[in-house]
């Protein structure tokens, strides 16, 4: 199964970032599963941009970045910064959640299609049931893929999915660099090779970013200690506890989750992560 192999690779390769983002999600008391949304958006790659202009791990459009005060300059594009993009994306998702009456399905749809389009669809349809709204197929499948991902993670054994130990991979930290944002200066001060510094910080289009101050710099603190004998799957599942999602993403009987009425059934989705679906390519 190509999708399963791809997901396993991306989970393993993205584990350091997933752990860090989950901490930010938890600090905001948001559903833990949101830490995996960049898997749908960008396969958790920091350095990608779509032909539509969305960039970074959270695929933020320029207007959204501006709205949440992310700097975008020739020398520095904060949409590629894991800390800056995560802060903006979670702020946006939190706002959407409140705007749509604490409905996560509508919030996710609006993250993909824009709140204006989703609000118009709700008003026109006279219902908040996502699957009854006139929305682009891409948006409906976007939400369905996220629900499918939640199910895949929750039922890994059933789908022959091998989950990596939660503490696998490198440990990343974020340091605030006071004053002018010079990745080169930081790397020289810390004795870090520039290519290693750039690997975690693709927001820097140039080694220095004049006009940008107090920027977050991501760095690796090396690998994790050897895993204990504790069941790694249990550790992973606990860390992304789907219980925190309540009804919105568990496909239990709840308002707005009658997917059959919207003629979208997860069982019929042969490509839950959208790997074979035509959409704007991600460019390095």
Predicted segments, located by residue:
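Generic alpha-helical secondary structure signal
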Residues: 16, 32, 59-63, 67, ...
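Extracytoplasmic and endomembrane cell-envelope/extracellular-matrix remodeling and assembly machinery
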Residues: 1-23, 27-28, 72-75, 79-99, ...
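Short, surface-exposed glycine/acidic/tryptophan-bearing loops
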Residues: 47-69
